[in-house]
């Protein structure tokens, strides 16, 4: 704001509302606007609001369930390991104290150590049966569904629903331990088949 001689007027105020003492002359007011970055924006360069998974990524990031693979990457297409999955569930539970079973291939210094111990102690995972958990192994669909099935049961969620999975051409290849979990997951809409009928 300037008076008719071009002298700047003193502005007072805050929060977008400003005042000045009106001089005995015409006043020229020029307003300039600056765009600010969306404070709600995620820090990841590989996740945009147009992505179908944006809201889910925002939720897990805002709630400290997942943090991404680096400061600016979430890596949404990265395959998930067994250690990652139990860590997600562990954080979802508020990272409770964990003690009990320790697998021979889970080093206490690893980020997933407490999560694996907690998951095993609560019957969410049981490992491979040879004393190993395989934390860095990529998790398969049937393993993931089995983990979620046991996690839901542990939370007191009704897991009695079943749907026939025999319509899928590869249903015969589902491991025996995972059949009930797959039937439950299909019944509740957690999974569906692929376009090729598998």
Q: Regions from the language model: what does each represent?
A:
Residues 21-36:
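C-terminal beta-strand-rich structural cap/linker in extracellular carbohydrate-active enzymes
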Residues 1, 31, 57-60, 119:
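Extracellular/surface recognition and adhesion modules
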Residues 9-11, 34-54, 62-63, 67-115, ...:
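Feature responds to low-complexity, polar/acidic, surface-exposed segments characteristic
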Residues 1-20:
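Surface-exposed interfaces of beta-sheet-rich extracellular modules
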